[in-house]
């Protein structure tokens, strides 16, 4: 049942990125190596069927680190939210916002989950498998099954074996600060100043320094960096949280807003922000459309880099993505020559092309 649920997670990742994909429901063999693409609508229907079966089979009382049946409910809620905002993927008759609510509220009402008191600690080994965690990958330096620390730890932040490739657009950081100037989540999410582990020299990137070269123009994403500066191994042991309770509360806020449950929607946002000593900003008070825009930004402030950014940006369609993500970035007054200009071509930015390696080895795919 857990393997079925994990398969659904991966199917969802694939269909979100590529749309129509080969849908494997049996293992390939010598007589079954090639598979034509199935419509994304059929892939989502299969995910729903599998997740419903996983929910019925998964245990409610396994030990620490094991996902419970409520992870399947959260997956179902996420899928129904996608179908609610993409009518061509659904059956044309279901109230997908209500279905999403019904699944998400099961997780909340289970009483199994709560917010971890310290936001930044979620991204350390001491914050692993907390009551906030709904589905968490168990990673180990000994098992050598995670490169997150190596890829996200800035250059010379620790003693060795890292690259520090991944930064955050300055416009994303600026938007976060503009909405919540004193947000404790800023320190848990971004890094822009540190001393090198080898010689104690200062390293500054934006906003701790000016934007006079590309490397210095964007803060690092700190969530998955190795926090132990004396660590020198290639792999590390910080787990990766796939689903957590704060995400569920924001989902319930978005869903409740679409169902005109105004007070309930605001209550979920208040729970998430109360953890970090904040209250909902003025955009939450401007009616359904204003609340919708605010909650879509809130996902970014709370969950940046945790696996849902690309989909949340695109889930409400091309025009919403263009007007709420791409153009605000491209027209940012703080933008300079060290910023990327985001593409606006719908045919190129909504879905990825099937990789050439798959096209050339699968006789039933030609594009």
PLM feature segments, named:
Residues 154, 180-182:
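Intrinsic disorder
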Residues 1-148, 184, 188-190, 194-367:
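Acidic/polar-rich alpha-helix caps and helix-coil junctions
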Residues 154-173:
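Short, cationic low-complexity segments
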Residues 148-154:
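Active-site-adjacent substrate-recognition loops and nearby beta-strands
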Residues 151, 174-178, 192-194:
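Extended polysaccharide-engagement surfaces of secreted carbohydrate-active enzymes
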């Amino acid at each position: 049942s857990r393997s079925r649920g994990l398969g659904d997670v991966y199917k969802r990742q694939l269909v979100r990125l590529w749309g129509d994909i080969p849908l494997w429901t049996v293992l390939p063999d010598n007589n079954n190596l090639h598979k034509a693409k199935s419509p994304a609508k059929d892939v989502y229907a299969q995910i729903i069927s599998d997740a419903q079966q996983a929910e019925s089979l998964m245990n409610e009382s396994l030990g620490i680190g094991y996902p419970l049946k409520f992870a399947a409910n959260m997956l179902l809620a996420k899928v129904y939210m996608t179908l609610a905002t993409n009518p061509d993927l659904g059956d044309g008759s279901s109230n997908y916002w209500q279905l999403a609510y019904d699944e998400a509220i099961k997780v909340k009402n289970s009483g199994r989950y709560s917010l971890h008191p310290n936001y930044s600690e979620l991204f350390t080994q001491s914050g692993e498998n907390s009551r906030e965690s709904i589905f968490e990958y168990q990673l180990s330096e000994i098992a050598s099954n995670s490169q997150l620390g190596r890829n996200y730890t800035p250059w010379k932040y620790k003693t060795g074996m890292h690259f520090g490739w991944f930064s955050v657009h300055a416009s994303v950081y600026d938007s976060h600060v503009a909405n919540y100037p004193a947000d404790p989540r800023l320190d848990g999410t971004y890094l822009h100043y540190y001393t090198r582990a080898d010689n104690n020299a200062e390293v500054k990137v934006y906003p701790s320094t000016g934007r006079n070269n590309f490397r210095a123009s964007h803060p690092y994403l700190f969530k998955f960096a190795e926090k132990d500066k004396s660590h020198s191994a290639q792999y590390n042991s910080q787990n990766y949280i796939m689903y957590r309770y704060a995400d569920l509360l924001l989902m319930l806020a978005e869903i409740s807003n679409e169902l005109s449950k105004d007070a309930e929607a605001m209550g979920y946002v208040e729970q998430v922000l109360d953890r970090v000593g904040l209250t909902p900003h003025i955009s939450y008070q401007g009616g359904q459309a204003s609340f919708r825009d605010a909650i879509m930004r809130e996902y970014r402030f709370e969950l940046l880099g945790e696996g849902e950014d690309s989909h949340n940006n695109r889930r409400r369609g091309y025009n919403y993505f263009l007007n709420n993500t791409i153009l605000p970035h491209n027209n940012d007054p703080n933008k300079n020559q060290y910023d990327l200009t985001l593409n606006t071509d719908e045919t190129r930015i909504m879905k990825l092309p099937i990789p050439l390696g798959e096209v050339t080895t699968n006789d039933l795919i030609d594009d």
